[in-house]
Amino acid sequence: MKVLYVCTELFPFLKTGGLADVSAGLAPALQAVGCEVRLLLPAFPAIANQALSTRPIASLPAGPMPWGPAPVLPPASLTLATLPGLELPVYLVQAPALYDRPGNPYLGPDGKDWSDNAIRFAALGWAGATLGQGLDPHWRPDVIHCHDWHSGLTPTYVRAFAAAKQATPATVFTIHNLAYQGLFAAAEVTRLGLPKSWFDIDGFEFFGKVSFMKAALRYADRITTVSPTYAREISSEAQGCGLDGLLRERANSLSGILNGVDDLIWNPATDALLPAPYDEHKLQGKTLAKRALQTKFGLEPRANALVFGAVSRLTEQKGLHLLPQVLADMVQRGGQLALLGQGDVALERAFVDAAIRYPGQVGVRIGYDEVTAHAVIAGADVILVPSEFEPCGLTQLYGLRYGTLPLVRRVGGLADTVVDCTLENLDEGSATGFVFDELSPAGLLSAVRRAFVLFRRPDEWLAVQQRGMGLRFDWLASAQHYLAMYQTLRPGAK
């Protein structure tokens, strides 16, 4: 089965968040379970400049289509590239006027969305749909799997071709975060090459705007999210971001499949970024990682300190606004904090101020880099993920793998992957972390206090550590679920 994987980020070439990790893990896993996979991405400089070779395929089609004009694009073409360390072929949408810009792929130097993001990502969608129509005469996908709003017009264009009685591949759309919807002015409809008659409440119109996310949810053959709980949550008014009605309407086409962890990158037994390797049977290396983390973040080198770690975007969605309000209690109990992240300026300032207020107990790095992320996740005793909502979450999975107990809120993928250290769960041997419900300082603090209690019981702590480290959230399991879904989309499948 030929699968075209459409996305905008790919680790280690370009990463702004977990989407890059998912692409790097899932696409090769799909190949490993028998799919013939090719990726499609914009030719952002961070990716295109690392290509080992490129071969021209075709210019993107222009002019009239059966439903009206094609998207109005600057010169754009498709090349087939090879990237270092990646065995999968990669199509790159070459459009220098759209993509040849430094820095963040979505934001300008002012930190705001590029004003032409609608056409930038319409070009990606158009490339995906026309590959489905045979743009590459040597390779045509059976399934096009699209990820997040940036690729949301791919299923829309595919449906437009299907409405014109042309043979089309099946389409799958995965929601990584429903809150980011790709909303643009209604005036963009003609320039985007979309059927004008579809700009209504039953199409891709959303409160008077074009919604790339709604377009995908309306026109994709199947919809997935990155955890079963998140699939249920977004079908409710509370977390549906205004699209819950459509998602309930499409309930039979919606499912949740958990993300996995790339064992080549996140494995303490082989992680070259750590002071020493370790596993669930030999944890001496974790002790060294903790000492190294304390040194790196300017924390007092106390072996008996309960070190909390956080690697996150600093936003209210991630629940990090609660943390400054519980730091006094955490430090008073002998705890420490090592935080790596960036985002909301006010939150950044709050954490920098906390590091000044609690020298030797709170260490903060504003920014992000992989080396420090590995240091925090390996060296901390507890990893904090107190999110307001969390489609899947990868940080808690990394924590489990590294023997760093996750402390999470019971939402989305966090609820699906972490078992609370209640007395009952400890007794039956299923506990893997700390879970709380109420999105408040009091809710977070209750879980923090329970972490201190368990930390004073080293034998029980070790048992929970080892249980989490023994779990495997691997991409092959996720890929098998996706493959089974793809197979239901074959012509004649029941």
From Swiss-Prot:
Pathway it works in: Glycan biosynthesis; glycogen biosynthesis
CC annotations in GO: cytosol
Keyword Repeat: no
Signal peptide segment: none
Enzyme superclass (EC): transferase
Gene Ontology molecular function: alpha-1,4-glucan glucosyltransferase (ADP-glucose donor) activity; alpha-1,4-glucan glucosyltransferase (UDP-glucose donor) activity
Species annotation: Albidiferax ferrireducens (strain ATCC BAA-621 / DSM 15236 / T118) (Rhodoferax ferrireducens)
Pfam entry (one): Glyco_trans_1_4
Similarity comment: family membership: Belongs to the glycosyltransferase 1 family. Bacterial/plant glycogen synthase subfamily.
UniProt xrefs under Gene3D superfamilies: Glycogen Phosphorylase B
Protein name: Glycogen synthase
Keywords recorded for this protein, A-Z: Glycogen biosynthesis, Glycosyltransferase, Transferase
Highest taxon above the source species: Bacteria
Protein purpose: Synthesizes alpha-1,4-glucan chains using ADP-glucose.
One Gene Ontology biological process: glycogen biosynthetic process
The enzyme's E.C. designation: 2.4.1.21
InterPro entries to which the protein is assigned, alphabetical: GS/SS (IPR011835), Starch_synth_cat_dom (IPR013534)
Positions bound to ADP-alpha-D-glucose: K15
Catalytic activity: [(1->4)-alpha-D-glucosyl](n) + ADP-alpha-D-glucose = [(1->4)-alpha-D-glucosyl](n+1) + ADP + H(+)
